[in-house]
Amino acid sequence: MALESLFKSIHTKTSLSSSIVFIFKGKACLLTSKSRIQESFAELNSFTSLVLLIENHVLLHAREAVNEVQVVNDSSWDELVIGSETPVLVDFWAPWCGPCRMIAPIIDELAKEYAGKIKCYKLNTDESPNTATKYGIRSIPTVLFFKNGERKDSVIGAVPKATLSEKVEKYI
């Protein structure tokens, strides 16, 4: 990862007497030795945000683009979708739905192609019925598009990738 390489480079150029702290997933980690960096990065394989402080000065605050579809549910909806500054695509699906399984690889491809430009989430309607009801989801798969916390568009059914790509391009 690019952030990991940058952090290792900074760590090797900084004296061990310096206070080096990185924060990920809301947890702070103080690096006090060269061996500690190896342990820390084993834990960082899936980090999406990093804040680096040296001697109490913020040196780096970076986010990596998430290039895979993440799960959203009733409890995380407001934070991940409504609170997002990046446009959002949400796939409403259920495990028993054949067309949902057909469209899933297309959503995965879009997440990779548009990493950093759009966030892609999937919401299991069986596990999160409140959000599905709130947005009037009556057929699945349904893909909703949000920008600045507002619902902008929807696509119902298993559609070709080109249809979804066109919608994504409209909102990025």
UniProtKB/Swiss-Prot annotation:
Thioredoxin domain location: 61-172
Disulfide bridge map: C97-C100
CDD domains attached to this UniProt entry: TRX_family
SUPFAM superfamilies per record: Thioredoxin-like
Transit peptide: 1-60
Active-site residues per Swiss-Prot or TrEMBL entry: C97 (nucleophile), C100 (nucleophile)
Protein name: Thioredoxin M-type, chloroplastic
The species this protein was found in: Pisum sativum
